[in-house]
Amino acid sequence: YTSGTTGNPKGVVYHHRGAAINAVSNVLDWDINKHPVYLWTLPMFHCNGWCFPWTIAARAGVNVCLRRVDAQHIFAAIKEHGVTHYCAAPIVHNLLVNAPDELKAGVPAGVKGLIAGAAPPASIIEGMEKLGFDLTHVYGLTEVYGPASVCVKQDEWNDLNIGERARLNARQGVRYHMQQAIAV
């Protein structure tokens, strides 16, 4: 049963094959290298953590857990543990963009984040890029194991100004690589 984050709790039937396929899709669509350091800003019980418990295990990664989701703890964990990846809703990214400058100081550039859970405003994507984060927009549903489509960034976007890149990255994407294999 789901946590009911967007309404009343509901029952959803998953199968191991679907979860494994979506975990592999996470690796392929987000280009996750070996030994990632993954920061848990979303609950593992919600949609099975978007299948990232298995995704990170498949890449021999490290899981960094938080006791509280707030800007201070997130930035501290990124700096202390060398976080390379995390997933979060736009509201969490908004916390980071609007955090005091002293919390943001020393955060390494290139930390990769998935943004999902609600349509992300281009301003949040732009704000995170200005902080040095590399966000990828995905969309999913509890019924499809979490992420199901991804806004695939195009190389030519690198030549655009930051505002235009953010606008394009906020758009809906294409189906995850292996979503068709999950359909039964």
Language model feature labels by segment:
Residues Y1, N8, D31-V37, M178:
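Conserved pre-ATP/AMP-binding loop-to-beta segment of ANL
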Residues Y1-I21:
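Conserved AMP-binding A3 loop
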Residues A20-V37, F45-T84, A99-P100:
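Conserved AMP-binding/adenylation subdomain of ANL enzymes
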Residues L42-H46, G140:
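AMP-binding (ANL) adenylation modules
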Residues A58, V83-A88, V97-A170, V174-A183:
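Gly/Ser/Thr-rich phosphate-binding loop
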